[in-house]
Amino acid sequence: MSVTENTPSLTANIPNFLANGGLPPGTGGVTTFPDAAAARAATSTYYPPDVKDPKSIDWTLGVQHSFWNDYTLEVRYIGTRGIHLDVQSIVNLADLVTPSLFLPTYTNNVPSQAALNASPINLNTILSSGDGVVPAYDAAGFNGNALTAFIPAGSSIYHGLATQLTRRMSHGLQLVGAYTYSHLIDNSTADFHTTDLTPRRQQDFEDLNADRSNSALDHRHRFTMALVYDEPFFKGSNAFTRNVLGNWEIAPIYTYQTGEWMTAQSGIDANLNGDQAGDRTITNPAGVGVTGSGVVPLCTTAIPASECTLANVLNFPSAVVGYAATNPSAKYIQAYYGALATTGRNTILGPPTNNFDATAIKRFTITERYKVEFGVQAFNLLNHPQFIPCCAAGAGPGALGGATNAVTAQAVTGSPRNALEPQRGIFDNFSAVFPSEARALQLSLKIFF
């Protein structure tokens, strides 16, 4: 038996409902366009027709050996190849700045005023060199908005050597130690803007290969050691001796991991492609350490010297012919409007994890039925600063309520990206943007009956 429920359709009396796009009559919140050309110009999202599911190809080879009755050693090689990975891109925008058309940034030997006046290229030369739209999209009419797309063009490769030593519980001692040496390379990681530490889009939308580098997920070294020591003595002693000197358990855990790779960013649309998310910095080959510098504009005498400021660069583009670093010894220099960024993706290594936790437990036997267990747990026992990257993109812990690094007592303020922009005073000062938990002790008491 079948039952049919007759439900009146809300669109039954609308002629040609599907033929007209499946939208009810009336404007409501729906935008209409006079023709297809206007619709194309207003388009801001692109769905590629050849979407492919991400794939992971894995291979491994390992050997395991047992020795000395209680020990097992395992050594493995692990490889992973990722293809068709998601990449966020703006497919219709092109760089106006190119290797053959850019404003120079000087660290020393700044040209004389006469040489600046004779410069054949100024910022306006670059701004007027094109409309910043890829010719194919321009010809098709997709030139009114940035055309954001998620395309399956990403790739990654991982190679790792993993070792693990295990001692089974014997004579009161259990041990598990592991060390991994690995390298992960990719050309995109944070396509959904889950972090500010590595850009969510590539710097040049027409050259994804230029973003191939150490992945933000690449932690080259990782070592862990976990012990459980159940003190085996006094097991056969009388109750008093066993309760006073025996029944101890100690369980330390140590973890070391190299830091996260991060990208030095200029925080400005230096390559003039309409997007500042991926713009990086200029690397000074003679720079010292991980140091940063801002820039000042170099102008012709077409404007007064007092008007030659960063704030006025776009107001007087015909007079701006270059930039000079405020700190010529810095390794990373901000790329300003029209400058050519030369820094690769993920070239700054963040602080490592260096953590030691420990647990101590003392058991007391009152009677055969009643037992008491007292425990002490110590987290970050050695009180090492653990400036671990955190927080959603665009909001550092300071923005979420004024956190403070408990170890250093330094205020945590602003977005983590602030420590990656060389023109800022907190460049490479991760303690200013990452929280760190101080040593913490936890007591526990358990009664068994």
Per-range role (PLM):
Residues 11, 15-26:
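Polynucleotide-recognition surfaces of large bacterial nucleic-acid defense/processing enzymes
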Residues 22-24, 28-59, 64-449:
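Short, solvent-exposed micro-motifs at the edges of structured domains
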